[in-house]
Amino acid sequence: TYGAKAAVHGKYVLTDKLWAYLQAYAEKHRAAGNGFGFGLVTPEQTARTLSARYYKDGSEILVSRGKNKNPRRLTPRECARLMGFPEDFQIPVSDTQAYRQFGNSVAVPVIREVARIMRPHVLALAEQERTGALQAPLFS
């Protein structure tokens, strides 16, 4: 699932029935003026938000396979990449559980950067508490 010619297992391709349903459902909502729709992207485009419900039908992020071909869902590995997990991260659970877990995750690079910025402040507060310079306890 990496690169332009990467092979993806057929189980990730939407069935004719599901693809027809999603198109009809989107059209019904478009006609009613609602915002429902599926997210169809090419590998070069930015993906939409990955949610924990992705395992149901994958409609938030569908990958185009070209004209007259049903789109496919992301693979769990692609979801891991979107969320910033390293390539060597092992996915020890079923696809369904992996989709839920990655959809509930916060992007790893975001957490890393927040922690990097917070670290000196947390250490300074801890030092103030240790030396008695802190006016009020951090936690009570």
Predicted regions and their residues:
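S-adenosyl-L-methionine-dependent DNA methyltransferase catalytic core
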Residues: T1-S140
